[in-house]
Every structure is written in structure tokens, then in C-alpha cells.
Design a protein with these regions (language model features):
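Cytosolic regulatory regions of ion transport systems
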Residues: 1-225
Length: 225
């Protein structure tokens, strides 16, 4: 049984169904963040693998409402469905979670059509991990960004190198928002942690910046660094 960083409240408990690559990583990350996690899978090998890493792990058929009730899933306010390849099991699991009263359901989808079906049977949040990762990698390959995250509304955050003309100047003096429309969120110098950006923050040569803005603004800024 995994030990948590803090004692979780009931609202912080999460059930993760499907302990493959995606679901397992989500579950493990939630435990590290201090949440109580119930892992559910019908594969005994996966159940055994995760038994020492998660708070609780059980073997059960997630498409069966009675089975979910018996293992205590109905007591969890939030669920993540990490089943991807078996679309029928994915949909039936979301439906079963809805029927037993789980309030908030996150579900992995492998296609837009799959995602629409998941929403129609009760998933409030649909995740497309392969598509999101593919788009992220494409941005990194075709730009000078070091890391990139894009949100659904066209807003993006990127890690990129500071422009050469920024060296030794304050953020207020550089005026990146005026020039590019981006907001500098953090600044990192070699050998130091990121610090929150302020107008008076000086940008040493070779610094790394965390910037936020529209996807177009962030891309334009990264291209200029």
C-alpha cells in the first residue's frame, strides 16, 4: 500500500479504472499528490503490479454496476476511466459509473467519435492523450520552444530561451507583452530554480522563460528567441 503525502479528505479521493500505461501513470501521479486512489482493473497481472504502489487496488469488471458497488467505487466522488483500446468496455464503464452516482467522470478517448459517445453516457471530461501529445511534439519540432502546453481555448504556455537582447535587462524594460503579446510567468537562470516574474525581474544571459499567451503569440515569440 502506498503512503500519502498528506491525509486526504473524502472529496480528494479518486478511483482510476484501467491500469494500463495511461491509467497507471495517472493513478501513480495522484498518489504522489496526496490523493487516496482506488485502482480497478480486470487483469490480475496489472492488479498485482500496482498493489504496492497505489492506496488500494482491486480486480473487478468495471462494466458491472454491482461489481463496482461491491468494491466501494460508489463512495468516490471522482473517477478516471483509462480504458482506451476496448471502446465497448470504456463506454459501458462510464455508463456504470453514472448509474451508481459518481459525480465527476474523466474518460480517455481514442477518437472524436469515441469522445462524443463517452460524453453522451455521462463523462463530463474527455481526454485525448495521444492527440495532445502528438500536437505538443509537433510544436516542439517546428519551433525553438523547449516545452509547450496548449489549452482548448487557444491559450498556451511555453518554456523557451530568453531573447539575446533581453540579457541584463528587466522585464519591464524588455516589454515582451507590448512586442509579442505574451506574459512572462517565470524566469530561470542556470543552476537556479524558477522564480515568479515581476516587472523588476532582471533576465541574465542564457535564461529560460515561461511565457503565456494565445498559441499564435507564443509561437511568434518563440520563433524570435
Amino acid at each position: 500500500m502506498a503512503s500519502n503525502a498528506k491525509a486526504p479528505t473524502a472529496d480528494e479521493n479518486v478511483v482510476v479504472i484501467g491500469l494500463g500505461r495511461f491509467g497507471g501513470q495517472v493513478a501513480e501521479s495522484l498518489v504522489r499528490l496526496g490523493h487516496e486512489v482506488l485502482g480497478v482493473d480486470d487483469d490480475p497481472k496489472l492488479v498485482q503490479h500496482w498493489s504496492e504502489k497505489l492506496t488500494h487496488v482491486v480486480q473487478a469488471d468495471s462494466t458491472d454496476e454491482d461489481a463496482l458497488r461491491q468494491v466501494g467505487v460508489a463512495e468516490f466522488p471522482r473517477a478516471v476511466v483509462g480504458i482506451g483500446t476496448d471502446i465497448e468496455a470504456s463506454v459501458l464503464t462510464v455508463l456504470a459509473l453514472t448509474e451508481i452516482g459518481v459525480r465527476e467522470i474523466w474518460a480517455k478517448a481514442t477518437s472524436v467519435k469515441h469522445g462524443k459517445i463517452l460524453r453522451s453516457v455521462g463523462a463530463q471530461h474527455v481526454i485525448y492523450p495521444e492527440a495532445a501529445m502528438g500536437e505538443r511534439v509537433a510544436h516542439l519540432i517546428t519551433s525553438r520552444m523547449l516545452d509547450f502546453i496548449e489549452f482548448d481555448d487557444g491559450f498556451a504556455i511555453a518554456k523557451t530561451r530568453a531573447p539575446e537582447d533581453a540579457a541584463g535587462r528587466t522585464l519591464a524594460d524588455i516589454g515582451l507583452r507590448t512586442r509579442y503579446g505574451v506574459t512572462v510567468v517565470g524566469v530561470k537562470t542556470r543552476g537556479s530554480d524558477f522564480v515568479y516574474a515581476r516587472p523588476e525581474t532582471v533576465v541574465p544571459a542564457g535564461s529560460i522563460l515561461i511565457v503565456a499567451g494565445t498559441t499564435e503569440q507564443v509561437q511568434r515569440f518563440a520563433a524570435a528567441t
